[in-house]
UniProtKB/Swiss-Prot annotation:
Residues 119-155, 385-417, 870-879, 944-961, 1025-1034 are extracellular. Keywords: ATP-binding, Calcium, Calcium transport, Calmodulin-binding, Cell membrane, Cell projection, Ion transport, Magnesium, Membrane, Metal-binding, Nucleotide-binding, Phosphoprotein, Synapse, Translocase, Transmembrane, Transmembrane helix, Transport. Its main location: membrane. Residues 299-308, 342-354 have a biased composition (Basic and acidic residues). The modification Phosphoserine is found at residues 8, 1126. It is found in: Cell membrane; Presynaptic cell membrane. It comes from Rattus norvegicus (Rat). This is Plasma membrane calcium-transporting ATPase 3.
């Protein structure tokens, strides 16, 4: 210790063993000493603690804290600790400045083209050839221009430049506000993170950022450790340290062998208490974080140089593969200095379960690329036609010769043609689409927070709208999670109510009180109500709270028992987990013997009982026949009432021979049953209605629970998941596995496809069963469309299922940190109704995007045709470049804001899910787009060719190069904008509804934007002048423009009258690429194609997925870092790391190890994002939670994760009606079809079948 102290801080004298030396703040150890201590592991660390502090209690004394009482909750003391030892917080790197965002916006290819064209146009406008040369060059423009007009030629170029500046500023502001929004979301996620500490002897939940050195923290199963610490007392504690050490095996921690607990690691089993020794940048995780960021500047420069040198092809080949696959497009890699990094990722990619890209993202990607290509082709054709027309007319028809002095004049024309071509491109590309997606998602996420949905992955919000199946937990989600004991079996008597204490013998009562008080987490308590008349507060595990409440109902108290036998005197604890389904605690008796108390699921624990207490409290033999009688007469009736049954038992061991405590099967056996209690967990009153809504919306709800089959069936019936007369399956985990596995024990998809369509309840299930079910439903090919599955989970071992599902919901109250980390959405109230709201918001996002597409594509179709046709016929576009920038970039931005903020309505839940293959642009929408385009084109071409006669004004066609704005073309522009404004109102409805004004005043943003856009248009037309190529219009002309605009609403009614079913010729657009449509190679090629489109087309096209993934990109960095070794450990383990990398393909669970150098640059790049981790414990918010880090302890039953695109055989016809004794018999059996559709059209009527679901046809 002295060596380390001297090497770390030279001015400190070498401390003597166990001798306190006063340090800064009066504490007995320095920050450097604690940092040095936390670098050690195992026996080395124990020796250091003994040499320097004597033991852990000595360390606590040095830190002026009590191992049992914790810190005094004194503000001054806490602040002093933060000043000396640091805060549990890593300062984030400053977000990009507004100027940096402006510079990014300027990198857009289309804008650069416009800038160049504008500058060239500006330069040439100042060149005027002599008069005689001008005559020799010819007046190919169709008219002469006077001197004043020629002098004003610079205005067009300047106006385009000004418009580009406006667009850049708007884009930069949008990016800035978006980043600000994401920072707010990140801040919200941070605030949700709390940890349990002891202060003043009281258990408190404090934000992780409020932890200080010296805090006594409670550690329990499922926690993500927020700081470094030393274990004071632990019960069967196992930690997953793979995020720091790369070791995939769980590490057993104990106060006498390895007490070192590190931040960022997961508690996979057990519980305990630790003293916090390092926080923030001084913790092991924080040290690595800081070191990785330190060299970021240099690495960033290297990256920039590398990016300049790399070609587009090379950069596209080094795409980083997102490991949860939930993003639409593969993002650019966060480059590392190590070439092997990429290869290692590629090797691992096949082993990591991937979610498919989100439905909307996949469709938008395809649509954006298609539109972009069409725009490029149209603009190229336009330029070619204009140039050929000019060349043929000038040099062939007029027979002129190219004179050197005429070159600037001709170039001026070519520049004009080029600008027109760029205008067509600008018009074709839906610039507002990415913004509409971002706004819609951001708006929905913000509103969903109020509906108790904390969205961690933005795309999950939209994916939820397509959900076809929800696999829900029971406890706390469908039920209130306020449990109470309502029935019990004690002393050979079945009590339907709480028995009077006098009815029980003292021995039974004492044993019961001790068994419950001691064999429960000491952090679980019943506290007095906060308000008079309210219910007592339940703190901790709800099942244990119910048992403690049972003691209080028997007029006894658990607290004196716990004070008599404190937690640190417990001899051995077998903590609860999903495999054991029980908890056991061993205490030493006064005579030197031992007593074991055990509680757990009644069917499991009763099998281990060989005795039972009779009415006198005496032991009586408990034979298998007795157990069967008890199951039939006691447990099944309780379960049929919807009660959870818990058995409480004990066993005594003599002092003569101490058993082998590690042999759990031997120890927890030969038990004596004290009692069986029935615990009621009432169904939430709002849940049955929520499930009815789901069923109406075409979503099948399945309950997956660890409870008894009878309990689960009773609760499912109360919730409405199963109904009388419906053919369904209720299976236990064992029966489920028997049905889906072959003789070799392997899962067969065909077998699974026979089970899941009818399955409604899966009882006595393990987390592995849940993962198998979710994977089986997702991989199934029995239907026309791939199922979109949502799953709820709260336990550490639910991680695989949460990650595998399309949308994973974690419980905000009861959920572990690991479950939250693996999820997409956190239910802050643990309520199923919040999931229904998420469905509604998801569908609303989909509709909002479709509304905007309907509006945007109408604008695009009309503008492209007008610009293309007008340019080819009149050699000039009726809609000028500046006007197009206004319409397409600014006005559409407002439209995206207006249409993307429409609030959801209950009617969204009255239709079936869209499904993965349902196009973004339905036939009804295509009818609307083309119908309105026909109206608008008819009006515009009429105005273009005969408008001057109708209004008795000069024609604007074939005007000279720099002629002043004409009233003719201004009327065309104004009419075009008015039609778009009123069509924006039409676009609010996309399913053929007639009342387009329905609910319009419930969206003030929409009303404000429509009126605001109208006001700006008035200003542009009346005062825009030459910059906007506008001439002021008279009142009469304005009224005509408005009249034509209002005609859009009337025309919309005409279009709504035409039945879509009659228009067979209409095609749909924006289909999502199906999972079975493409091979892996084709998918890879598609990604390459998208990457090229990224470079060729306007940045706006890919802004939508950049917005969706902005948080995920940063989280990827944290995930990469999590799989790294500590800075010191990385050096020590370098050789073992390399050997493991060679063997990685041979491991069923790859060990994720990274050398620090490999991601200095990537981590630093992530840190400059505004949503960078402001606290190192934001791992809860990390989207990249790798199942592989712990999957080996939850063995996956098959290995089909490797290839998700593998062709699967169609399932044979469904089996005959269920004969399993776990199923409820039904007089009416509904036929399950081999192919199903997620849309309502798939359901045909069948007499005598009053019920329906996604798996049954009516």
């Amino acid at each position: 210790m002295g060596d380390m102290a001297n090497s770390s801080i030279e001015f400190h004298p070498k401390p003597q063993q166990q001798r306190e030396v006063p340090h800064v703040g009066g504490f007995g150890c320095t920050l450097a000493e604690l940092r040095s201590l936390m670098e050690l592991r195992g026996a080395e660390a124990l020796q250091k603690i003994q040499e320097a502090y004597g033991d852990v209690s000595g360390l606590c004394r040095r830190l002026k804290t009590s191992p049992t009482e914790g810190l005094a909750d004194n503000t001054n003391d806490l602040e002093k600790r933060r000043q000396i030892y640091g805060q549990n917080f890593i300062p984030p790197k400053q977000p990009k400045t507004f100027l940096q965002l402006v510079w990014e916006a300027l990198q857009d290819v289309t804008l650069i083209i416009l800038e160049v064209a504008a500058i060239v146009s500006l330069g040439l406008s100042f060149y005027a050839p002599p008069g005689e040369e001008s005559e020799a060059c010819g007046n190919v423009s169709g008219g002469a221009e006077d001197e004043g007009e020629a002098e004003a030629g610079w205005i067009e170029g300047a106006a385009i430049l000004l418009s580009v500046i406006c667009v850049v500023l708007v884009t930069a502001f949008n990016d800035w506000s978006k980043e600000k929004q994401f920072r707010g979301l990140q801040s919200r996620i941070e605030q949700e993170q709390k940890f349990t500490v002891i202060r003043n002897g009281q258990l408190l939940q404090v934000p992780v950022a409020a932890l200080v050195v010296g805090d006594i923290a409670q550690v329990k199963y499922g926690d993500l450790l927020p700081a470094d610490g030393v274990l004071i007392q632990g019960n069967d504690l196992k930690i997953d340290e793979s995020s720091l050490t790369g070791e995939s095996d769980h590490v057993r921690k104990s106060a006498d062998k390895d007490p070192m607990l590190l931040s960022g690691t997961h508690v996979m089993e057990g519980s305990g208490r630790m003293v916090v020794t390092a926080v923030g940048v001084n913790s092991q995780t924080g040290i690595i974080f800081t070191l990785l960021g330190a060299g970021g500047e240099e690495e960033e420069k290297k990256d920039k140089k590398g990016k300049q040198q790399d070609g587009a092809m090379e950069s596209s080949q080094t795409k980083a593969k997102k490991q949860d696959g939930a993003v639409a497009m593969e993002m650019q890699p966060l480059k590392s200095a190590e070439g092997g990094e990429m290869e290692e990722r590629e090797k691992k990619k096949a082993n990591v379960p991937k979610k498919e890209k989100s439905v909307l993202q996949g469709k938008l990607t395809k649509l954006a690329v298609q539109i972009g290509k069409a725009g490029l082709v149209m603009s190229a054709i336009t330029v070619i036609i204009l140039v050929l027309y000019f060349v043929i007319e000038t040099f062939v028809v007029d027979g002129r010769v190219w004179l050197a002095e005429c070159t600037p004049v001709y170039v001026q024309y070519f520049v004009k043609f080029f600008i027109i071509g760029v205008t067509v491109l600008v018009v074709a590309v839906p610039e507002g689409l990415p913004l509409a997606v971002t706004i819609s998602l951001a708006y929905s996420v913000k509103k969903m927070m109020k509906d108790n949905n904390l969205v961690r992955h933005l795309d999950a919000c939209e994916t939820m709208g397509n959900a076809t199946a929800i696999c829900s937990d029971k406890t706390g989600t469908l039920t209130t999670n306020r449990m109470t004991v309502v029935q019990s079996y004690l002393g050979d008597t079945h009590y339907k109510e709480i028995p009077a204490p006098s009815a029980l013998t003292p021995k039974i009562l004492d044993l019961l009180v001790h068994a419950i008080s001691i064999n429960s987490a000491y952090t679980t308590k019943i506290l007095p109500p906060e308000k008079e008349g309210a219910l007592p507060r339940q703190v901790g595990n709800k099942t244990e709270c119910a048992l403690l409440g049972f003691i209080l109902d028997l007029k006894r108290d658990f607290q004196p028992v716990r004070e008599q036998i404190p937690e640190d005197q417990l001899y051995k604890v077998y903590t609860f987990n999903s495999v054991r389904k029980s908890m056991s605690t061993v205490i030493r008796m006064p005579d030197g013997g031992f007593r074991l108390f055990s509680k757990g699921a009644s069917e499991i624990l009763l099998k281990k009982c060989t005795n039972i207490l009779n009415s006198n409290g005496e032991l009586r033999g408990f034979r298998p026949r007795d157990r069967d009688d008890m199951v039939k007469k006691i447990i099944e009736p309780m379960a049929c009432d919807g009660l959870r049954t818990i058995c409480i038992a004990y066993r005594d061991f003599s002092a003569i021979q101490e058993p082998d405590w590690d042999n759990e099967n031997e120890v927890v056996g030969d038990l004596t049953c004290i009692a069986v209690v029935g615990i009621e967990d009432p169904v939430r009153p709002e849940v049955p209605e929520a499930i009815r809504k789901c069923q109406r919306a075409g979503i099948t709800v399945r309950m997956v629970t660890g409870d008894n089959i009878n309990t689960a069936r009773a609760i499912a019936a109360k919730c409405g998941i199963i109904q009388p007369g419906e053919d369904f399956l209720c299976l236990e985990g064992k029966e489920f596995n028997r049905r889906i596995r072959n003789e070799k024990g392997e899962i067969e998809q065909e077998r699974l496809d026979k089970v899941w369509p009818k399955l409604r309840v899966l009882a006595r299930s393990s987390p592995t069963d849940k993962h198998t079910l979710v994977k089986g439903i997702i991989d199934s090919t029995t239907g026309e469309q791939r199922q979109v599955v949502a799953v709820t989970g709260d336990g550490t071992n639910d991680g695989p299922a949460l990650k595998k599902a399309d949308v994973g919901f974690a419980m905000g109250i009861a959920g572990t940190d690991v479950a939250k980390e693996a999820s997409d959405i956190i239910l802050t109230d643990d309520n199923f109704t919040s999931i229904v709201k998420a469905v509604m918001w998801g569908r609303n996002v989909y509709d909002s995007i479709s509304k905007f597409l309907q509006f945007q594509l109408t604008v695009n179709v009309v503008a492209v045709i007008v610009a293309f046709t007008g340019a080819c016929i009149t050699q000039d576009s009726p809609l000028k470049a500046v006007q197009m920038l206004w319409v397409n970039l600014i006005m559409d931005t407002f439209a995206s804001l207006a249409l993307a903020t429409e609030p959801p309505t209950e009617s969204l839940l009255l239709r079936k899910p869209y499904g993965r293959d349902k196009p973004l642009i339905s036939r009804t929408m295509m009818k609307n787009i083309l119908g309105h385009a026909v109206y608008q084109l008819t009006i515009i071409f009429t105005l273009l060719f005969v408008g001057e006669l109708f209004f008795d004004i000069d024609s604007g066609r074939n005007a000279p190069l720099h002629s002043p704005p004409s009233e003719h073309y201004t009327i065309i522009f104004n009419t075009f904008v008015m039609m778009q404004l009123f069509n924006e109102i039409n676009a609010r409805k996309i399913h053929g509804e007639r009342n387009v004004f329905d609910g319009i005043f419930s969206n003030p943003i929409f009303c404000t934007i429509v009126l605001g856009t109208f006001g700006i248009q008035i200003v542009i037309v009346q005062f825009g002048g030459k910059p906007f190529s506008c001439s002021p219009l008279s009142t009469e002309q304005w009224l005509w423009c408005l009249f034509v605009g209002v005609g859009e609403l009337v025309w919309g009614q005409v279009i709504a009258t035409i039945p879509t079913s009659q228009l067979k010729c209409l095609k749909e657009a924006g289909h999502g690429p199906g999972k079975d449509e493409m091979t892996d190679e084709e998918l890879a090629e598609g990604e390459e194609e998208i990457d090229h489109a990224e470079r060729e087309l306007r940045r706006g096209q890919i802004l939508w997925f950049r917005g969706l993934n902005r948080i995920q990109t940063q989280m990827e960095v944290v995930s990469t870092f999590k799989r790294s070794g500590s800075f010191q450990g990385a050096v020590r383990r370098r050789s073992s790391v390399l050997s493991q990398l060679h063997d990685v393909t041979n491991l069923s669970t790859p060990t994720h190890i990274r050398v620090v150098k490999a991601f200095r640059s990537s981590l630093y790049e992530g840190l400059e994002k505004p949503e960078s981790k402001s606290c190192i414990h934001n791992f809860m918010a990390t989207p990249e939670f790798l199942i592989n880090d712990y999957t080996h302890n939850i063995p996956l039953i098959d290995d089909t994760d490797v290839d998700e695109n593998e062709e699967r055989l169609r399932a044979p016809p469904p089996p005959p009606p269920n004969q399993n004794n776990n199923a409820i018999d039904s007089g009416i059996y509904l036929t399950t079809h081999a192919t199903k559709s997620a849309t309502s059209s798939a359901f045909s009527s069948r007499p005598g079948s009053p019920l329906h679901s996604m798996e049954t046809s009516l």
